[in-house]
Structures are given as structure tokens and as C-alpha cells.
Amino acid sequence: MARLTLDGLRTILVACAGEDDGVDLSGDILDITFEELGYDSLALMESASRIERELGVALADGDINEELTPRVLLDLVNGAQAEAA
């Protein structure tokens, strides 16, 4: 099973919710909250659904919130994949 990378996460975010004009997703966004990146809870839930469909990783609703950072989300997804392997 392929690990989710930051580039892969960027692709999912843009596909699910678009890209805020004021945010450069190509920069170092690992430790910026999704709220600061312009993604609300609905966008994050759509992204989580896509992660589940594409990678087979179901994230708990309590894990997904606007204070989450891409680094933490990547750790959650990749950690769940490692446990399932």
C-alpha cells in the first residue's frame, strides 16, 4: 500500500475543496493548520472520504478538525496503513 506524501495530500485537498487564492500550497505547509490554509471542516471531511476511498484508511471523525496540520494528518494516515500491513 502506498504511503500518502505531502504532494499526494495537496492533490487530494485541491481536488476536494480547491485552493484558496491567498495560500501557496507548494510551500512548506506541514505545520500550518488547515484553518489557516483556508480549509473548513466540510473540506476536510471530503478529503478524509477521498483518502478512505483511495488508500483504504478510515479516519475517525474526531481526528479531523480545522486545527489539524498536514503533518499530523500524514502521520495518522501512514500510521494506520502501517498498522494494517
Curated annotation (Swiss-Prot):
Matching Pfam families: PP-binding
Description of post-translational modifications: 4'-phosphopantetheine is transferred from CoA to a specific serine of the apo-ACP-like protein.
O-(pantetheine 4'-phosphoryl)serine found at: 41
Domain of life the protein comes from: Bacteria
Keyword Phosphoprotein: yes
GO biological process, one term: antibiotic biosynthetic process
Domain (Carrier) ranges: 3-81
UniProt pathway: Antibiotic biosynthesis; granaticin biosynthesis
Assigned keywords, A-Z: Antibiotic biosynthesis, Phosphopantetheine, Phosphoprotein
Cross-referenced SUPFAM superfamilies: ACP-like (SSF47336)
Record function comment: Acyl carrier protein.
Protein name: Granaticin polyketide synthase acyl carrier protein
